[in-house]
């Protein structure tokens, strides 16, 4: 795939981003599949970010988290991960600018920053700097400095409410998801011997003792 075709396809996928997991995964898979175009595709993220609404920007922020997660799962280092960690403060400035839109996005930006920090995509200093940027913009918004922000439309607000519901639903589902067994537990399970005749005799003795205690108290 040539760079022009890759950019057009990727921009279309980014334009369809919303709170659903599918809309986040599809462009991430495309980006990973076409690593030879990673710089071109990364520039598309910024194009969409700088031209989109405040809802689009927060969806881009969540997409960045999804892309990093999929890179790590596929054993990919450098590339997208390095570019994202390098530009993390610039990313925050665009998603949570000073003003009403930035203030509305600030809580979501914090969640993504925490996730990226836990994944070690950004280091401690980058995390602190990015969080400080969010805090500074949020405080400036509360003080009334909204000169750099636009108004939020009613449709944008309604869309955000709907997408927040979808995100919270996914969070609840993830809480109940059963994670893969840890290596230590898996080793213990695989090395444990089966039940022997001696084990069965011991269980039988314990059961008889339990019944005796039960009858003694009745």
From Swiss-Prot:
GO molecular function annotations of the record: calcium ion binding
InterPro entries in the record: CID_dom, Ctk3, Ctk3_C, Ctk3_N, ENTH_VHS
Spans traversing the lipid bilayer: none
Record carries keyword Transcription: yes
Subcellular location: Cytoplasm; Nucleus
Cellular component GO terms, alphabetical: CTDK-1 complex; cytosol; nucleus
Gene3D superfamilies, A to Z: 1.25.40.90
Keyword Cytoplasm: yes
GO terms (BP aspect): mRNA processing; positive regulation of DNA-templated transcription, elongation; positive regulation of transcription by RNA polymerase I; positive regulation of transcription by RNA polymerase II; positive regulation of transcription elongation by RNA polymerase II
Signal sequence annotation: none
Compositional bias ranges of the Polar residues kind: 141-152
Region (Disordered), start-end ranges: 137-157
Pfam families in the record: CTK3, CTK3_C
Alphabetical UniProt keywords: Cytoplasm, mRNA processing, Nucleus, Transcription
Entry coiled-coil feature ranges: none
Chain ranges of the CID domain: 2-138
The protein's role, per its UniProt record: Subunit of the CTDK-I complex, which hyperphosphorylates the C-terminal heptapeptide repeat domain (CTD) of the largest RNA polymerase II subunit. As part of the CTDK-I complex, involved in RNA polymerase II transcriptional elongation and pre-mRNA 3'-end processing. Together with ctk2, required for ctk1/lsk1 CTD kinase activation.
Subunit and interaction comment: CTDK-I consists of three subunits, ctk1/lsk1, ctk2/lsc1 and ctk3 (also called alpha, beta and gamma).
Family recorded in the similarity comment: Belongs to the CTK3 family.
Protein name: CTD kinase subunit gamma
Protein's organism: Schizosaccharomyces pombe (strain 972 / ATCC 24843) (Fission yeast)
Lineage of origin: Eukaryota, Fungi, Dikarya, Ascomycota, Taphrinomycotina
Gene that encodes the chain: ctk3
């Amino acid at each position: 795939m040539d760079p022009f075709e890759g950019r057009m396809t990727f921009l279309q996928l980014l334009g369809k981003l919303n709170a659903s997991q599918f809309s986040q995964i599809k462009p991430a898979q495309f980006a990973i599949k076409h690593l030879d175009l990673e710089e071109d595709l990364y520039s598309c993220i910024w194009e969409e970010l700088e031209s989109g609404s405040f809802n689009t920007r927060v969806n881009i922020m969540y997409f960045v988290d999804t892309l990093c997660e999929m890179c790590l799962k596929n054993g990919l280092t450098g590339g997208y991960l390095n570019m994202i960690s390098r530009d993390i403060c610039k990313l925050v400035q665009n998603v949570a600018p000073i003003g009403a839109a930035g203030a509305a996005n600030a809580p979501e930006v914090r969640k993504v920053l925490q996730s990226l920090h836990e994944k070690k995509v950004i280091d401690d200093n980058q995390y602190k700097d990015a969080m400080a940027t969010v805090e500074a913009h949020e405080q400036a918004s509360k003080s009334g400095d909204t000169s750099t922000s636009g108004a939020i439309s009613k449709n944008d607000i309604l869309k955000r409410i709907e997408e927040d519901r979808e995100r919270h639903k996914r969070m609840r589902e993830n809480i109940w998801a059963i994670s893969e067994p840890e290596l230590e537990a898996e080793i213990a399970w695989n090395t444990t011997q089966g039940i022997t005749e001696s084990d069965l005799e011991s269980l039988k003795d314990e059961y008889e003792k339990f019944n005796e205690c039960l009858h003694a108290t009745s």
